[in-house]
Amino acid sequence: MTMVMFTKNREVKGLHQLFLDQIRDIYNAENQQIGAFPRFAEAALHSEYRTIVKKHFEQTKNHILRLEKIFENLGENPTDRECEAVNALIQKAHDIAEKNYGPRALEAALIAAVQYIEHYEIAGYGAVRSFARQLGDDESANLLQQTLNEEAHMDRLLSELAEYEVNSRAAEVSTRLFHA
């Protein structure tokens, strides 16, 4: 009986530490985006894309505040832990922006690059929300769910914009150039 109790306590401590490590990772990811998203918005011609990215930039500030609230509630500091994955995805987006795809294809590429970041965040927020629920931290779970909803909404907006406007315009230009 004692061995089972010891193992269970160790698992709870392990999940709690995993939760902290992962929200630190997400916290850094959000802060990296604060520096990157304005450049992503400026790089595109499509006004709706710029509007979506600028709105998400403002939401990202709220995501950071929610994470800081979670750290405060847990009595923890959001110590800097570099999110290497988002750092690499942001670098990939910068590399894409420097290629000579032409303006229409560049917009399609930028949307895809931002969606890579969004998908990483959706996975991360979904995981930490689940951890918070398992740890009985309903307040953190609710805050994380709010952000998860916003991230998913951003992804849907970008998908719709890409699918119904940007990608088709890029394809038209490519088709005209290819068949000319």
Where are the language model's segments positioned?
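Amphipathic alpha-helical hairpins
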Residues: 1-180
